[in-house]
Swiss-Prot record:
Keywords: Hydrolase. Coiled coil: none annotated. SUPFAM superfamilies: beta-lactamase/transpeptidase-like (SSF56601). NCBIfam families: Gln_ase, PRK00971.1-1, PRK00971.1-2. GO terms for biological process: glutamate biosynthetic process; glutamine catabolic process. This is Glutaminase. The gene is glsA. Its EC number is 3.5.1.2.
């Protein structure tokens, strides 16, 4: 377990990076976030959580929600059903690319780009009567926080600027790889992205990825083998087009979101979340990545 003073030191070491990135501005509600926010939290497999900086302040988790969506899908479907609809390869394209969908006949490269996450949302819609309710239930349970909510203003803001995601969904539908009403699936998807959670919430919620599929409450969320596979996907595809850079610098499976959060996992040991809203050119938190790199170096830990 890292000590709290180590986390506080790391926060101060990366603070000079604030002002060098850019807050996501294509979602108006996200553009208003204070760019100086900076937090880190760690939860160990024995259930302890420590943090530093703004680690208790909720933020919009955005694409980090794709980990929860895929996890829920794995509890509802045989794996072969999921992987017949979406691939497992890094994309090498922007996270909202239409070109790749056209070239690969409606099958997205992986579940962590927008197209792949929309397929997962479509799968959830097919099996769940109230997907939004189920997702909130799952996340509250995993984080041990019954007060986690959807930020309805962020969800509405994303829906109002949803033309590209709608285009992706309709293009996949034209190839026969989308089964439900596009508008309904989009509304659910934007709600998942609009979950508001703190670094502490997320480090707790993602503990199952570090603990062979067991959550903070010792529930078996997914099997140990599924957990290993999830971590493999996170290591190769979790950081948009910056996955290689992240693996090189940080050396952990991870997932980022344009809200400035990044979750990372040291299997068998701990789950981590950092938050700093300013992003680098790949859409990943600039100071957050640096904080994870420093933590990895300080602990001498990497999966490689």
């Amino acid at each position: 377990m890292p000590q709290k003073d180590l986390l506080e030191t790391i926060i101060e070491q990366v603070r000079p990076l604030l002002g060098k990135g850019k807050v996501a501005d294509y979602i108006p509600a996200l553009a208003e976030v204070d760019p100086t926010k900076l937090g880190i939290a760690v939860t160990t497999i024995d259930g302890q959580t420590i943090g530093a900086g703004d680690y208790l302040e909720p933020f919009s988790i955005q694409s980090i929600s794709k980990v929860f969506s895929l996890t829920v899908a794995l509890t509802l479907y045989e794996e072969a059903e999921i992987w017949s609809r979406v691939g497992k390869e890094p994309s090498g394209q922007s996270f909202n690319s239409l070109v790749q969908i056209e070239l690969e006949r409606g099958v997205p490269r992986n579940p962590f780009i927008n197209a792949g996450a929309l397929i997962i949302a479509d799968l959830l819609q097919s099996r769940l009567g109230a997907p939004k309710h189920r997702m909130l239930e799952v996340v509250r349970k995993l984080s041990a926080n019954p007060h986690v909510i959807y930020d309805k203003r962020v969800a509405a803001s994303e829906y109002e600027h949803s033309a590209r995601n709608a285009a992706i969904a309709y293009l996949m539908k034209s190839f026969g790889n989308f089964n439900n009403d596009v508008d309904r699936v989009l509304r659910n998807y934007f709600h998942y992205c609009a979950l508001k959670m703190s670094c502490a919430d997320l480090s707790k919620a993602m503990l199952y990825l570090a603990n062979r599929g067991q959550s903070l409450s010792a529930e078996q969320v997914v099997s140990p083998i599924q957990t290993r596979k999830l971590n493999a996907l996170l290591a190769t595809s979790g950081l948009y087009d910056g996955a290689g850079e992240f693996a090189y610098r940080v050396g952990m499976p991870g997932k980022s979101g344009v809200g400035g959060g990044i979750i990372a996992v040291i299997p068998g040991d701990m789950s981590i979340c950092v938050w700093s809203p300013e992003l680098d050119k790949n859409g990943n938190s600039l100071a957050g990545t640096a904080a994870l790199e420093k933590l990895s170096q300080a602990l001498g830990r990497s999966i490689f």
